[in-house]
């Protein structure tokens, strides 16, 4: 099943593919990103997840000023997890964040301080609440499923279960 893409999604993707460095200038303003059609494959879900990762502020009123920018931007996952999570990043406060490549393979994860097992979904909820200061997507919502698909795609080829060694 072919799913049409909105021009606001297609144009930045084409610019990013054709012109290195153009992606940041061409991205749509952050806000609420809502899936407009059902997806029929994990690749489509991951593509939607990438858009949510880059553009959804989850209702947060927080802003940040990227390096070399003249104005502030709404907080999104991409505010801290640069290059779509494919590179190491920092929070606006300066804390180091590792790349998200392989991150999905590290879940579930035991958090000793909380004596709890965190699933990937629970970690996303934590990041949206504590990092973005927004309202996280519901656990079985299309947005959560798409975010998990995106992070899982970034983990393709990673060995699962390394946290149990």
State what each model feature region is.
Residues 19-25:
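Sec/Tat signal peptide C-region and signal peptidase I cleavage site
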Residues 8-18:
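Bacterial N-terminal signal peptides
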Residues 7-8, 23, 86:
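Intrinsically disordered, low-complexity segments enriched in polar/charged small residues
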Residues 1-4:
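Positively charged n-region of N-terminal signal peptides that target proteins for export
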Residues 26-44, 57-165:
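Electron-transfer interface patches adjacent to heme c in soluble/periplasmic c-type cytochromes
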Residues 6-7, 39:
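Generic hydrophobic-segment detector
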């Amino acid at each position: 099943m072919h799913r049409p893409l909105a021009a606001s999604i297609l144009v930045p993707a084409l610019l990013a593919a054709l012109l290195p460095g153009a992606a940041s200038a061409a991205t749509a303003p952050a806000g609420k990103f809502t899936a407009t059609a059902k997806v029929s494959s994990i690749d489509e879900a991951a593509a939607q997840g990438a858009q949510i990762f880059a553009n959804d502020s989850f209702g947060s009123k927080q802003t940040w000023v990227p390096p070399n920018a003249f104005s502030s931007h709404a907080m999104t996952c991409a505010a801290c997890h640069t290059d779509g999570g494919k590179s190491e990043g920092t929070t606006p406060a300066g804390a180091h964040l590792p790349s998200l490549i392989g991150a999905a393979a590290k879940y579930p994860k035991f958090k000793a301080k909380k004596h709890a097992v965190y699933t990937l979904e629970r970690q996303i909820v934590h990041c949206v609440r504590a990092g973005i200061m927004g309202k996280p997507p519901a656990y079985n919502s299309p947005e959560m499923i798409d975010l998990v698909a995106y992070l899982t795609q970034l983990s393709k080829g990673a060995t699962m279960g390394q946290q149990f060694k």
